[in-house]
């Protein structure tokens, strides 16, 4: 009796499991079909990532990554008349899970492409090239100032040149790729530095001003944007040396190859226009020329 039940259970699993696998693989491919049927594309963004994604004066999101995603929306709109955009604010800690669960179709913010993140989502070709650096006070420990403001090259993690990490409290955005890189560097060197995670960049900058930490780490492009919007940044100095080198991308659901191809084609076409240089100048000023060369050099071709 038990054997017959076991055989029936196995037979059911043999029939059901392949169907479930097909269903999970087929679901992402239906994103463009759903967009066409509902005439709505759902874009998620992290609101405190100026100048990549931030609330505008009218409450609607704006920023470099948002504008690039608008190019994608316009491309889809060529075949879907009356297409509307539904924006959703997300916390960085929840953003990738929300995308994987199908709550949004695209993530448009300052999103570093990492292998760990690619376990649950896919990314477009790079939309930006940057790296993590430090924001310091004018009276931050001298060793930290020499390391990130000096002329010498940053040494490998185990080098004595990273000794200042051993006596410092350093802040970082919780859940960011910079947090992972900073933790790895400190662990590799067996330093006793304290990493203090913050929920938002604004909290981290406030802690730096209040001397709760000696330095705040984030992608350099984000730090530039934060300095421009911080009420009193005269006492803060942006590091010129990079701890990491990273690329940003637009995030999509894993396996959503049709939408990813459309996004990549849209980006490559836009990179070849004068409008791309104008967009970079709008958000990054004099650094636009160098940024354009770096991004275009990594772009996909037809």
Where would I find each of the regions flagged by the language model?
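Bacterial N-terminal signal peptides
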Residues: 11-22
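Sec/Tat signal peptide C-region and signal peptidase I cleavage site
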Residues: 23-29
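Extracytoplasmic small-molecule ligand-binding "clamshell" domains
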Residues: 29-115, 119, 155, 197
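A conserved helix-loop-strand patch within extracytoplasmic ligand-binding domains
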Residues: 30-32, 78, 82-87, 112, ...
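Ligand-binding clefts/hinges and TM-proximal coupling segments of bilobed small-molecule sensing domains
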Residues: 36, 153-186, 234-236, 267-302
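Periplasmic-binding protein-like
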Residues: 47-48, 128-143, 220-221, 227-267, ...
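Hydrophobic residues within well-ordered alpha-helices
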Residues: 72, 99-100, 208-209, 250, ...
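A ligand-binding cleft/hinge motif common to bilobed small-molecule-binding domains
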Residues: 94, 108-120, 181-188, 202, ...
């Amino acid at each position: 009796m038990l054997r017959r039940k076991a055989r029936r259970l196995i037979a059911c699993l043999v029939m059901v499991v392949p169907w479930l696998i097909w269903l999970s693989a087929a679901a992402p491919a239906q994103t463009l079909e759903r967009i066409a049927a509902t005439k709505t594309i759902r874009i998620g963004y992290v609101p405190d990532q100026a100048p990549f994604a931030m609330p505008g004066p009218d409450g609607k999101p704006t920023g470099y990554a948002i504008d690039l995603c608008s190019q994608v929306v316009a491309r889809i709109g060529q075949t879907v008349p009356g297409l509307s955009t539904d924006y959703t604010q997300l916390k960085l800690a929840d953003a990738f899970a929300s995308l994987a669960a199908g709550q949004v179709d695209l993530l448009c913010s300052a999103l570093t492409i990492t292998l760990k993140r690619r376990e649950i989502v896919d990314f477009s070709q790079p939309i930006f090239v940057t790296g993590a650096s430090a924001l310091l006070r004018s009276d931050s420990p001298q060793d930290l100032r020499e390391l990130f403001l000096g002329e010498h090259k940053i040494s490998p993690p185990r080098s004595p040149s990273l000794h200042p990490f051993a006596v410092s409290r350093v802040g970082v955005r919780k859940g960011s790729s910079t947090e992972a890189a900073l933790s790895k560097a400190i662990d590799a060197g067996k330093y006793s530095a304290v990493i203090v995670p913050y929920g938002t960049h604004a909290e981290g900058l406030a802690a730096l001003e209040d001397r709760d930490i000696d330095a705040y780490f984030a992608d350099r492009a984000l730090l530039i944007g934060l300095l421009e919007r911080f009420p009193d940044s005269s006492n803060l100095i942006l590091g010129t040396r990079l701890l990491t080198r990273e690329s940003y991308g637009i995030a999509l659901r894993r396996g959503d190859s049709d939408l990813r191809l459309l996004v990549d084609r849209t980006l490559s076409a836009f990179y070849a226009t004068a409008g791309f240089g104008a967009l970079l100048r709008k958000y990054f000023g004099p650094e636009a020329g160098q940024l354009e060369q770096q991004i275009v050099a990594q772009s996909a071709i037809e």
